[in-house]
Amino acid sequence: MRILVYGAGVQGCELAHRLLQNKKNVVTMLARGEWKERLDQRGLVIRHWVQCRTTVDRVATIDTLAPDDCYDLVFVTMQAGQLPDVLPILKQNRSEYFVFVGNDPHAVEVMQAMQRPADKIAFGFQSSGGHRDVDKVVSAHVGVDMTIGGATAPLSGVFRYRVKTAFEGAKYKLTFVSDMDGWLKCHLALILPACYLCYACSGDLSKATKEQRGLVLDAAWEACEMLKAAHIPVDDKENTDCYRAGTPGRRKMDAMVLALCKTPLGRLCVSDHAMHAVAEMQYLDEAFEGLRTRTSVRMTAWDTLRSQMPSWDIMRKKTAKARR
């Protein structure tokens, strides 16, 4: 299959690496600037942190997508806040099947903007974290998988087969769901409180107090209740029941949050991305606040944790200063 990975950040690089494990695939990455030069000269170098190994893949690159370029599958791994700038380019391209990978609170709107049949647009979330160094990607995962589906309906059999074929022979698990718009909004219910905590601790999760760790999960529970009030589908077994105080699911989540705060895995899986993607997190935060205006649900833990982080203006200035 001819496959394009549109975007060469951590998620796109890990995804391309997995797709290249299927030797029948011809994989191309869209990258720009110095990172494209690195990929062309040295290949796609990924340090798999948990596994203590480094992989190097040779992958073709492009820096623009022309309307007449055609691929069997296009995986878009741009941040949600960057999509408005690239959607016109993607819409004009003659490839049929697109998968938008990552946190996206506006899946339905993206699907509509692509002006294609709903069964030609999918949304996915890949379970890997990490950061990009000057010469390599550092990827943190304990096995990479993707939850994938249509915005508000299951993928067609043809689309499912195409996606499954792309990952044949790859060490990659696919989980198909029927409502990725709802799934992604539920995912933000946990991701955003975790980011608020990162910012409150200046990126050092080891400084988080027991009370703050508890607030993350209390806030996630409140967010799920808010989503229900906003008529967003919520899978209680996978979400609310894991965050409700006093439940077995909550005890497991308490242990997970503690591990993330006390081990380097938390830095690689949570802090690195939060601290390097402030603009994306602000975009997601504003989208979630927009959902809140549709309900009257009180979110005391959420607001308490959110108030402990610096303002978004301060966070952006810190990020800009660190990059100089």
Predicted regions and their residues:
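Flavin-binding catalytic cores
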Residues: 165-167, 212-237
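NAD(P)-dependent Rossmann-like dehydrogenase/reductase catalytic/cofactor-binding core
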Residues: 228-324
